[in-house]
């Protein structure tokens, strides 16, 4: 999963809400921050490792990782979001599942419900060759693809024929086009349908008249005594022929290609339907003599018979008749095979039956050609019975002829039937396809449907979209809308979120690895994603300038306008130096290594420094034990100029190198500010930087019922600054404030020792050195002789610290009354019962008790000692300390002994 967006930047912000494309360094950083990448194909999200995509580097997804510029990314994908590490492809999501599995498993399969042609197009888009298909899917894929290609070829031929009907090179193209559609395309309009129905009625009427003219009752004898057509029926036939002639001439005149019109099979049928009538009239009127009429009479009869071909004109209006004609034309191989089988059978069986029946009296099988008729009707299983064999041998031959005829005819007939069925379906499909294409063309001409590339459409309408969104954003300035116009950076929303809520230990190590190596700040990527258009930065800037001219009140540049609701940008810096303090001042004492770091600290404790430390307040909740030390800075310090504000520390990951470098920490209290100085030159022992905790709450668990106030320090997070990250152990710790008017070390002691008692109850703590423990830590129980130890209570993560300056005098009195007890260095852990905690606090100054049952907890010890003693033991290399602030512990009298496990507060 991609790394989460920094808290300073809204995670829901897309690239389309920003003005300029991202820099190459931002694109490279977003790819290197995570081992995984999100791929959104048609709205369906997929998550895959980068190394999985690297298996096919020459494919589209394989090239995705090498694209480091905005233009190269848009050549590979349609859109992207660097904050989410997500890349969008506007393609078929179902086909991509098979393609992504090919990257993972190396096996390419095609889903059963997937169209072969569509799957082939998807393979071409993603850059994968179809030869990688598995054998189980390859045959099905190629079969479907060939079938689809054949259908597309036929449709293309039909469309070429339709597109070949050009009327531009002729006179009156529009009128001729309308007339052609009226006569040739019955479905083009209502008038064309009516005209087709009238034409069919004339065909039927002429056929009926032709049939009735052969009836003797309706015939009339001419002057030569020969029967002739009825006059009334002749008039009906003349009207029909006139209609057919007019239709044929109009079709010929309106046709775009005259030669092609003559070669058309349907047009040939129309010509044969009307030509015999005119030939008969010409022959009859030109030859009036009896002798000449007798010579041409037979020719006239032939042309009269040809008039029956008018019935074939119905094929123009019937898809079934057209399919029959095309089937016979396409099945000429099967028809030829059928005729060949029949001819061979007829020849064989007619010869056999002739030799079997020639010796019989009054036989009808007088010759082999005379036997052809019997063999034909026998093989076709008709059997008229006008001729049949009489002998036994002839009957056997007749039986074999019947069986052979059934087998011979049954072989090619199904092929012909199948061809007819397929062609009929194909004709229906082509008719629907032609209608659909014509409807789309008409809609395109009318402007209803615009056929263009989606990217080009977005690119052309980008200006309109920007202006519309800008106007909509002006009316909604008071609302916290995330989907704001990317040309209005003054209204960008920066969501403030604690880092501990959006990150984990592992994510910190991965996310800021590159930043720690480059030793630079994390650069917020303000150029996420935009719409999938190929707009360059220059075009966007030009559009930006135009909008700023038209809208002078809107300042896209946040530096050019005042924003009273946003505090000024400032940065904090921590000055790390050694502070020379008197012997009574506190310093960090030496401590040994903490073995089980996973249960004692958490990286998320660093991230809790996210709020302001402007004034002290009393927490309404009782502070639990083992909390964290947190600091806070005001947003605007009085009297502090912007040039005096230091820069925040860079974002660094926790170093995993365990080096011997330790840090000496001292707390310097001044009337104006407080500076926590960490000197990396001191060597208290090797550090333990690898203190990442699996669970942030694992280091917060404890059984000590101690109730005191903890110090909280919060870094003021600037809204426009980069998100804060846990500082590295190799960097100084920033602590700077100006709102802490403490002057003495005893004042700090008051802060550390003050209990969270009910209101009205005086503090019970004395200035005794007491021990506070939660049980012996697993693995070690160090002792620190000659140490001044003071209690420092902890609280749960992100809890606020109470600093009540009104009780300073009580603590100073306690300090003066028991000066001898403060010098006691021996640590001691009292094992009193929880019920006797208050008595022990009053009598011995202990601030907490622990039970022996809590020995499995990994306790922590936060110890302060005098600066002089720390300097004295700075040469010791056997001790190790954690790179965090340590709270002091109050120990009991010198006579008491015990083990005080370390208690650590990480920041």
From Swiss-Prot:
Intramembrane: 369-380, 381-388
Cytoplasmic side: 1-190, 255-265, 318-332, 425-907
Motif Selectivity filter in this chain: 381-386
UniProt modified residues of type Phosphoserine: 448, 608
Ranges for region Disordered: 1-22, 503-534, 680-742, 761-859, 887-907
MF annotations from Gene Ontology: delayed rectifier potassium channel activity; protein heterodimerization activity
Protein localization: Cell membrane; Perikaryon; Cell projection, Dendrite
Post-translational modification note: Phosphorylated. Phosphorylation at Ser-608 of the FFAT motif activates interaction with MOSPD2, VAPA and VAPB.
SUPFAM superfamilies: POZ domain (SSF54695), Voltage-gated potassium channels (SSF81324)
Glycosylation sites: 287
InterPro entries: BTB/POZ_dom, Ion_trans_dom, K_chnl_volt-dep_Kv, K_chnl_volt-dep_Kv2, K_chnl_volt-dep_Kv2.2, SKP1/BTB/POZ_sf, T1-type_BTB, VG_K_chnl
Activity regulation field: Inhibited by quinine at micromolar levels. Modestly sensitive to millimolar levels of tetraethylammonium (TEA) and 4-aminopyridine (4-AP).
Topology Extracellular: residue spans: 213-232, 285-296, 355-368, 389-395
Ranges of biased composition (kind: Basic and acidic residues): 813-823, 833-845
Keywords of this entry: Cell membrane, Cell projection, Glycoprotein, Ion channel, Ion transport, Membrane, Phosphoprotein, Potassium, Potassium channel, Potassium transport, Transmembrane, Transmembrane helix, Transport, Voltage-gated channel
Topology with respect to the bilayer: Multi-pass membrane protein
One Gene Ontology term from the biological process aspect of the record: protein localization to plasma membrane
Catalytic activity: K(+)(in) = K(+)(out)
GO cellular component terms, semicolon-separated: dendrite; neuronal cell body membrane; perikaryon; plasma membrane; voltage-gated potassium channel complex
Function description: Voltage-gated potassium channel that mediates transmembrane potassium transport in excitable membranes, primarily in the brain and smooth muscle cells. Channels open or close in response to the voltage difference across the membrane, letting potassium ions pass in accordance with their electrochemical gradient. Homotetrameric channels mediate a delayed-rectifier voltage-dependent outward potassium current that display rapid activation and slow inactivation in response to membrane depolarization.
Oligomer and partners: Homotetramer or heterotetramer with KCNB1. Heterotetramer with KCNS1 and KCNS2. Interacts (via phosphorylated FFAT motif) with VAPA and VAPB.
Family: Belongs to the potassium channel family. B (Shab) (TC 1.A.1.2) subfamily. Kv2.2/KCNB2 sub-subfamily.
Free-text comment about domains: The transmembrane segment S4 functions as a voltage-sensor and is characterized by a series of positively charged amino acids at every third position. Channel opening and closing is effected by a conformation change that affects the position and orientation of the voltage-sensor paddle formed by S3 and S4 within the membrane. A transmembrane electric field that is positive inside would push the positively charged S4 segment outwards, thereby opening the pore, while a field that is negative inside would pull the S4 segment inwards and close the pore.
Protein name: Potassium voltage-gated channel subfamily B member 2
Gene: Kcnb2
